[in-house]
Design a protein with these regions (language model features):
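Conserved HGGG/HGGXW glycine-rich cap/lid loop of the alpha/beta-hydrolase fold
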Residues: 5-52
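Active-site loop/oxyanion-hole signature of alpha/beta-hydrolase fold enzymes
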Residues: 41-82
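Gly/Ala-rich beta-loop-alpha elbow adjacent to hydrolase catalytic centers
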Residues: 83-87, 91
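Flexible "cap/lid" loop of the alpha/beta hydrolase fold
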Residues: 92, 96-97, 102-132
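Conserved alpha/beta-hydrolase catalytic His-Asp/Glu region
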Residues: 117-118, 133-185
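Short beta-strand/loop motif that positions the catalytic acidic residue
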Residues: 187, 193-195
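Conserved alpha/beta-hydrolase "acid-adjacent" motif
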Residues: 200-206
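Catalytic histidine-centered segment of alpha/beta-hydrolase-like enzymes
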Residues: 225-236
Length: 250
């Protein structure tokens, strides 16, 4: 896991974890809006982008690495941790292990209800489709599914070429079988849960489960938006929601 930092360490630290198949560049718009007031850290999750050579193992392993980074480099606590998709699952895992590690948490489109059959069928499915990932036309389709803006497609395509088959298998398995830990109820963080109105039913159910589990949390359903579209396509709106959370307006 590579940790990219912008802004002064004298400012409160916000950590933002990208979604599966993306990288730290996906937070560019959000980071630019925050950098004058915050120290912004955008990790590159194992198996992605510049860290494509490091095999992704699991959400739990990624949470371990993030916790160690915070403990060793950031005095054990940060102002906020946010994440999208698999990045949001990592945030949930961190909250379930370290209740006092952050003041605020932003969980966007986190799947916390296990998908049946994911362990059995992932490897055969990846065996059939892995070669397609290297093809530009297929990456174009995937980019649209992930709501990647057109100006970022070339970066997305280059990064997709770096993902190993085993990392892809591990990511899909870990994402699909992840379930919410009971210990997350002990978190001291104020949590904002985000989900798109046009996301799959299981994603909206996951958001509702998180909201009902976390006392005092705020659930925001982004009208008309799909999976990941809020932070990727509308960074200013995303930042506005963060500022509302920090100010207690949500």
């Amino acid at each position: 896991m590579i940790f990219t930092e912008v802004g002064s360490r004298a400012h409160p630290t916000i950590i933002l974890l990208h979604g599966g198949g993306l990288s730290d560049w996906s937070w560019k718009g959000v980071a630019e809006a925050l950098v004058e007031r915050y120290h912004v850290v955008t990790p590159v999750i194992d198996g992605h982008g510049e860290d494509g050579r490091t095999e992704f193992h699991s959400i739990e392993d990624s949470a371990d690495k993030l916790i160690r980074y915070i403990q060793c480099r950031l005095k054990g606590k940060v102002y906020a941790i946010g994440g999208l998709s698999i990045g949001a699952q990592i945030v949930c895992e961190v909250l379930s292990r370290e209740p006092a590690i952050t003041e605020y948490a932003i969980v966007e489109s986190a799947l916390v209800l296990p998908v049946k059959g994911v362990t059995v069928f992932t490897a055969p499915a990846c065996g059939l489709c892995y070669g397609l990932i290297k093809r530009r036309w297929f990456s174009k389709m995937q980019a649209k599914t992930l709501c990647v803006p057109d100006e970022w497609f070339e970066r997305y395509y280059r990064d997709s070429l770096r993902i190993s088959k085993q990392s892809l298998i591990n990511m899909i398995r870990s994402n699909g079988k992840y379930s919410l830990k009971r210990s997350i109820v002990d978190t001291a963080a104020k949590v904002l849960i985000l989900v798109g109105e046009r996301e799959a039913g299981v994603m909206r159910k996951s958001a509702s489960l998180l909201h009902s589990t976390l006392s005092g949390s705020v659930l925001y359903v982004a009208s008309g938006l799909k999976h990941g579209e809020l932070s990727l396509v509308y960074p200013q709106q995303y930042v506005g929601l963060l500022e509302g959370l920090f100010a207690g307006r949500n």
